[in-house]
Amino acid sequence: SRLGKSIIKIEELAKQLKGKLAGPVGAYNGLSMIVKDPEDLERRYLAFLGLEASEYSNQLVEPEYLLRLLLECNTAFGIIANLADDLRNLQRSEIGEVFEYFSSTQVGSSTMPQKRNPWNSEHVKSLWKAMCPRVITFYMDQISEHQRDLTNSASQRFIADYVAGFTMAVSRMKKVVSGLQADTEAMAKTLENAGGRVRGGVLAEPAYILLGEAGVSDGHEIVRKITLECEKTGEPFFTVLKLKKLGVADAETFFENPARYRGLAAEKSKRIAEKYAALMKG
């Protein structure tokens, strides 16, 4: 959802980029001497480049068009880096819920041959770290002293460098996501341990909600005490809850499988993915 909104915004801002053929001070002085309608000539010339004329210009096109586009690119870059970081952490040895494609000839670590490094996700994060600070320069290039100066003659050359880095990160992230594999057993283990020291503690929240629905006024306190008992005895949350015989509706079927406590996660994720996939196709 975050990335989809940003992509749409990038497309909108890219279409708003403007150009100029209005002479060194934007007043069409020279063109007025050789053509009757210099603004028409400007429109036709820029049309070949897929651009419209800037509403106003001096020696430069208004810098905000490009600035806004670059800022939105950096927003998307941050979203991609955030995703890369999440996937990188999920591939840590002690979590291991997902992992990138790993070929039979690939080396994960120079000292630990058994290790798989999430190097693609790490590379995306590294690209973002290198490119993100350049936003400060984009802002600085918004200022053109006394209509025109050459203090951006070097700095703006690195815009292409930034766009190349952003494009590389997008390509690498696409590769990561398309080849991502899941370890469902590790995911189930994470779910089981989600309650910390309380086995099956992830069900504590729905338990006190159901108790409240059943008319139990101190459901939260009851569940809190059950979790303390679970910590002492090592018994799973559902086992102790069942022994209390609190009469929670549907407890037998609901609490036997913690995976049922997922709300609309799957349905909403699929709906959002389908929405933006359709928008990208136009």
Show where each model-derived region lies.
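Internal glycine-rich alpha/beta core junctions
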Residues: S1-D141
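Glycine-rich cofactor/substrate-binding loops
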Residues: S110-G282
